């Protein structure tokens, strides 16, 4: 037998043994869970559009209990629905769980120049978070308020036209147009409204509606192929929507940088406050030093080195990209679920309309009035309890072996929160856990909720940075809609909603009727 054949056999045995060892990881630990097949694990379940995998977690929780494990490709994941365990991982032991699980196709979190807040980790994440945080402060949100206000007014015109004569509409499509219009103006350099004419909307919808992405599966099983696919997509941007989007953002950012340089050279001063995220990111500067860890001494123990206190060109593109995707989809879904629940519960809708009429009596809703819409905030919080949106990112990767509540967690293991089970558990929410009850939030004492039991925007230091922007957009549009209309279900409304999705959990459609409150 030739040497080359012996080497091939040895290589095959080595690879097979490696994957078999990963696949049997939880069995060796005596932890139950869905097994799947060697090499694959249950990776195919992550690509099911008709049955969102995040909802499958709840089915498996019922079968295996509040803690179980599975493998998908080379990843090992522990699923938990114990809020104390979740809080320990996401908050108390953040130094040991500061990274997220990610597919190799998403890039190297330590080396990719365009890495963003969702996938970055360690001190690189900390630097990006520190630099990006001012963009989402109340001061910055005031600067883009007028931009959002313009989109609200434009959406109201489209709603009036679309619902004329009592016609039923798929309000999810309208909300997607609304959020895409805002993101286009604040992150893509778009000037003016492009509702129902935006060439990018269908492409972005396709990112969230893609069924069974074989490339993700390949990269999950054979990680080194991720860099190969990324190289190919960088050379042929049109072959992948994500890369094409990055290219569009690069063009918009380049134009803004060149315009700024030309204005400065000509001695032209800025016309006023920044109007979008591109300006805000270009202007951002930190007044603190950052910690970089070149060793494995732990996230919290590092030495200070000189680090750029501005976002780089590529980093700005990365942040604009993730805010484009996250800001478009999640806010549109939250608005859709809120509208659906209000239509299903007219007594709650009436109470909310009374608050809007009382706190926002003038035609225009001001920034300061938004904070007075306390009951609306309760409605949104309760909506996000019943329909958590981006539960797929409610996970943490163990970066240093540790013990959590008596359980040994090895480095490289992912911990995934079963958010839907937590949000519907009667132990934390009472016997009416399945019911839409905004009043449960009226006391304002969220400490009454078990820590780790409510994760609408995540938990701990990596909680969603865009939470304030999402609330602002949703409150502004809902207030205007409820001032003018009452939301009603029709025979076309799916009750209950049919949920689908991969990255987020979305309804197939939300057909509603908007009945004018006042006759003109």
From Swiss-Prot:
Gene3D superfamilies: Cytochrome P450. Its EC number is 1.14.-.-. It is an enzyme of class 1 (oxidoreductase). SUPFAM superfamilies: Cytochrome P450 (SSF48264). CDD domains: CYP3A-like. It holds the Pfam family p450. Keywords: Heme, Iron, Metal-binding, Monooxygenase, Oxidoreductase. GO terms for molecular function: heme binding; iron ion binding; monooxygenase activity; oxidoreductase activity, acting on paired donors, with incorporation or reduction of molecular oxygen. Heme binds at residue 464. Its cofactor is heme. InterPro entries: Cyt_P450, Cyt_P450_CS, Cyt_P450_E_grp-I, Cyt_P450_sf, Cytochrome_P450_3A. Cytochromes P450 are a group of heme-thiolate monooxygenases. They oxidize a variety of structurally unrelated compounds, including steroids, fatty acids, and xenobiotics. PANTHER family: CYTOCHROME P450 FAMILY 3, FATTY-ACID PEROXYGENASE. Belongs to the cytochrome P450 family. This is Putative cytochrome P450 CYP13A3. The gene is cyp-13A3.
């Amino acid at each position: 037998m030739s040497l080359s054949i012996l080497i091939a056999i040895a290589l095959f045995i080595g690879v097979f043994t490696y994957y078999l060892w990963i696949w049997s990881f939880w069995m060796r630990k005596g932890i139950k869970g869905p097994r799947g097949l060697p090499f694959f694990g249950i990776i195919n379940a992550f690509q099911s559009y008709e049955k969102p995998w995040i909802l499958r977690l709840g089915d498996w929780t019922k079968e295996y209990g509040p803690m179980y494990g599975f493998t998908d490709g080379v990843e090992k994941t522990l699923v938990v629905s114990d809020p104390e365990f979740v809080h320990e991982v996401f908050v108390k032991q953040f130094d040991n769980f500061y990274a997220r699980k990610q597919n190799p196709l998403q890039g190297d979190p330590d080396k990719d120049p365009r890495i963003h807040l969702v996938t970055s980790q360690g001190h690189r994440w900390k630097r990006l978070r520190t630099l990006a945080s001012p963009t989402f402060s109340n001061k910055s949100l005031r600067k883009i308020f007028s931009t959002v206000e313009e989109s609200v007014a434009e959406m109201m015109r489209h709603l009036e036209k679309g619902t004329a004569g009592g016609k039923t509409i798929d309000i999810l499509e309208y909300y997607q147009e609304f959020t895409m219009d805002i993101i286009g103006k604040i992150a893509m350099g778009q000037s003016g409204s492009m509702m129902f004419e935006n060439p990018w909307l269908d492409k972005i919808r396709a990112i969230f509606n893609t069924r069974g992405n074989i490339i993700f599966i390949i990269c999950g099983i054979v990680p080194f192929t991720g860099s190969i696919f990324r190289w190919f997509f960088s050379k042929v941007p049109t072959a992948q929507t994500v890369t094409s989007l990055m290219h569009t953002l690069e063009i918009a950012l380049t134009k803004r940088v060149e315009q700024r340089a030309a204005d400065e050279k000509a001695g032209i001063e800025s016309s006023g406050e920044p109007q979008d995220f591109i300006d805000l990111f270009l202007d951002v500067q930190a007044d603190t030093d950052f910690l970089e860890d070149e060793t494995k001494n732990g996230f919290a123990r590092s030495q200070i080195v000189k680090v750029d206190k501005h976002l780089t060109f590529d980093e700005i593109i990365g942040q604009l990209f993730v805010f484009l995707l996250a800001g478009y989809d999640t806010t549109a879904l939250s608005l859709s679920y809120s509208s659906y629940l209000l239509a299903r519960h007219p007594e709650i809708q009436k109470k909310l309309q009374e608050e809007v009429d009382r706190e926002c009596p003038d035609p225009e809703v001001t920034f300061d009035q938004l904070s007075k819409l306390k009951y609306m905030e309760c409605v949104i919080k309760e909506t996000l309890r019943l329909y958590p949106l981006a539960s797929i990112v409610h996970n943490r990767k163990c970066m240093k072996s540790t013990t959590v509540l008596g359980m040994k967690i090895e480095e490289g293991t992912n911990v995934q929160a079963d958010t839907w089970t937590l949000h519907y558990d009667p132990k934390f929410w009472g016997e009416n856990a399945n019911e839409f009850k905004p009043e449960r939030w009226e006391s304002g004492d969220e400490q009454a909720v078990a820590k780790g039991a409510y994760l609408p925007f995540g938990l701990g230091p990596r909680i969603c940075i865009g939470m304030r922007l999402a609330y602002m957009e949703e409150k502004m549009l809902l207030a205007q809609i409820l001032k003018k209309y009452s939301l009603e279900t029709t025979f076309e409304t799916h009750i209950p909603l049919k949920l689908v999705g991969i990255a987020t959990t979305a309804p197939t459609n939300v057909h509603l009727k908007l009945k004018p409150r006042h006759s003109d």
